[in-house]
Amino acid sequence: MYGAQVADDENDDNIFYPFASKIEWEIARWAKLRGSTSTAFTDLLSIDGVSERLGLSFKNANELNKLIDHELPTGRPKFKREQVIVAGEAFDVYYRDIIECVKSLYGDPDFAQYLTFAPERHYADDDETVRLFHDMHTGKWWWDTQKKLDAQLPGGTIVPIIISSDKTQVTMFRNKTAYPVYLTIGNIPKELRRKPSSGSHILLAYLPTSRLEHISNQASRRRAIANLYHACLRRVLAPLKSAGSEGISMCSGDGAHRRCHPLFASFVGDYPEQLLTTGVKFGECPKCDVEAKDTGSNTTPFHLRNLNEVLDALAAFDNGNLAFVRACAAAGIKPIIHPFWEDLPFANIFRAITPDVLHQLYQGLIKHLLAWLSEACGAAEIDARCRRLPPNHHIRLFTKGITCLSRVSGTEHAQICRFILGIIIDIRLPNNLHSGRLLRAVRGLLDFLYLAQYPCHSSETLHSLDEALDLFHENKDIFIQLGIRNNFNLPKLHAARHYHLMIMLFGTTDNYNTEYTERLHIDLAKDAYRTTNHKDEFVQMTRWLERKEKILRHQKYVGWCLAGGLQFEPYHSRPPDMTFRREQVMTKHPTAKAVS
C-alpha cells in the first residue's frame, strides 16, 4: 500500500524515491532524525560545492521540508487546531482524528503478525483450574465486553483504546510545559507497546496548559481547569461514540477487513491525573467508595463507584447549578460539566483507572518507606551501612548514602529496593523495641512490589500478592509505636488493594505502566520543543512530528525493499515464562574494565 502511494512511473527502479539517490535519502534521514537545527543544516549545504558534489536536489532545510511535506505519503493523520471555549475564554487544542489514529495502528504492517482479535483464556494446568493473566486479551474485561457487544451486534472485533495523559516540563527553567495525550490499542502485545522504538503509541493531542490565572477565586479556577480538560478530551474522543457502538470497517496489515469497535478501555496516569479524570476529591480513591479516613485500612469493605449514580448526578446539570452541585456531592464527585467519558459506549471510568507501579509504588510507598526507615533507624546509620556494602555487578552502590538524595527517580528507588532489607536486618530500634515487626513490614511491602511487576500472573501468584500486602498491614503499627506515623491514610497504599482485580481485568501491570508515558515525553514533547523557536511552539512541534513520522515510515519501506520484500514468519504468541532466571551477559570483546 505504501509502495503504491510513493511509486513514480519514471522512477520504478529507485526505491528511495522521492529522493534521487541513496546518499540523498541518507542525508535527509540524518537531518530529520539525528541532525542539528535547520539553520545549521542550511549553513552546511550553503558551503560552496557541498550540495553539488553530493548530488542533492535540495539546497537548504526549507526545500527538504517541502519535499517531505508534498512527496512523502502521510502515514498517520495530520494535526488539527481547534478552539475550545470554557468560562468565556477560548483555548487552542491540537489533536488528531482518533479513528484515523486507531486505523493507523491497526493497519500497520509491522504489527500485522502480532495483533490479537479476540479474548482468550490461558491456563497453567490441564484441568483448567489455574488461570493465567498477562496480555490484555487474557483479562476478564475483554471477555465481558465481548459478550455485551455480541448480544447487540454479533461478530464484532473489539479494539481496546488505552489513553494516557501527563503534563510535563519541556524546559529546565521558565516553567514551560506541554500536556500530551497518548494513544495505543490493546490488540498490540505488551512486549511491543513497551518499546518506544516500535511506534505503537501515537501522540493524540496537545491539551492547553493554561493555569487560568485570570480567575482569582481558587475554587472556581480548579473547577474551570477540570472543565477545560474534559471539554478538550470530549472533543478529541467524540468519534468513539458512534464508532464504538455501531462499528467501522478496518483493514489490518495482512489485508483482512473486520467490523471493529474501538472502545475506551483504560486510562493511564498518575494520581492527580486520575482525580482530574474521574472528578474525585483529593485524598479519596478514584476507583471505589472508601472514605479518605479509611484508606489506610486493609479490612474496610469497598465497592467500585456506581457509574449509574454518577451519570444520574451529571444529568442534573439541566436542573440548575445548585441542584447540580448537590447531586454531584451526593455521588462523591466534583461538579464537572459533561466529562469526556459520559457518553462513551461500554465505558466505566472508575473501572478503567489502572494501577501505576511507578508513582504508586516506587515514587509513592517505597519513598514513604525509606523516609520511615531513616527516622526509625537514624539517617547516619542507614548511610553508613550503604557505604559498607561490597561491590556487586547487579546492585548500584550509593557511596554517599541514600538519605541525602534529592529528586530520586524511579530507577534509583528500584536500585535501593534491592538492598534495603539486607542493611536493616540486624538494626536496633529505639526504646528496645523488637525489630521483627519492622522487618516483616518491609518484607511484605517489597514482596508486594516485586509480585506486582510479574510479567505473567496466575490465580496462585495473585493470592501471594494479597498475602504480601496483608503482611505489611499486620505489622505496620510498628511505625506508629516509633512515633513516625499517626495513621496510614495514604491513597497510594489503598490503591494496592485494587491490583488483584485490575490484573484480572486488564492483564499484568506492564500493560499500562506510566513509565512508558514518561519515556514518550522525550521523543514526542521535549525533543519536539527543542526544534522550535519557542514562540507559538505547538504549531512547530506538530509539524516537526509529522515530518519525523513520514521519515520513519519511509525508512521502514526502504529497509523492506532492500531486504527483498520478504514476508515475516507467522508469530505464535505464548505466555511469558513464569520462571525467573539470573543470566550473566558478557561482552563479545571483554576488557579488564568490563569484567572487573
Map each language-model feature to its residues.
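Charged (Asp/Glu and Lys/Arg) segments that form or flank catalytic channels of large polymer-
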Residues: 94, 102, 109-111, 116-163, ...
